[in-house]
A protein has these predicted regions:
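ATP/pyrophosphate-binding catalytic subdomain of soluble kinases
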Residues: 1-35
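C-terminal active-site/capping subdomain that shapes the small-molecule cofactor and substrate pocket
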Residues: 33-118
Length: 118
């Protein structure tokens, strides 16, 4: 949804924000396209952090894309210095905890530990 809103009245401002993304039933090549659309629209340039929830039931094509959803996302944001958290328990899968939208969170990602605090 975020990538489709780029350049419209529904576009989001990401400067200083922690962006949360997740998806369900998406093809890997579409995840790649959406990540690079967001990157080219400078949505990652001044992010404070990125939280990746469940990428549930991702699909591949007959000719394999060659990367997992996590690898695609890592590649898209590799040049930036903000913290990135994968497998956050918010998704369309079994683990679907609540995440407040619009809250002033702080995100810390370390080896084996993620802290998201208000």
């Amino acid at each position: 949804m975020l990538a489709h809103c780029v350049g419209t009245d529904s576009d989001i401002k990401t400067k200083g924000k922690i962006l949360f993304i997740e998806d369900v039933g998406e093809y890997l090549y579409n995840i790649d396209r959406m990540m690079y659309q967001l990157k080219r629209a400078d949505k990652f340039k001044k992010l404070a952090g990125l939280i990746v929830g469940g990428m549930t039931d991702t699909k591949d094509t007959e000719r394999p894309f060659g990367q997992t959803a996590e690898e695609i996302i890592r590649d898209a944001v590799s040049e930036y210095n903000f913290p990135v958290c994968f497998d956050f328990p918010v998704s369309h899968g079994k683990e679907n905890l609540a995440l407040k939208i619009g809250v002033g969170y702080k995100l810390k990602v370390g080896k084996g530990k993620v802290t998201l605090s208000e």
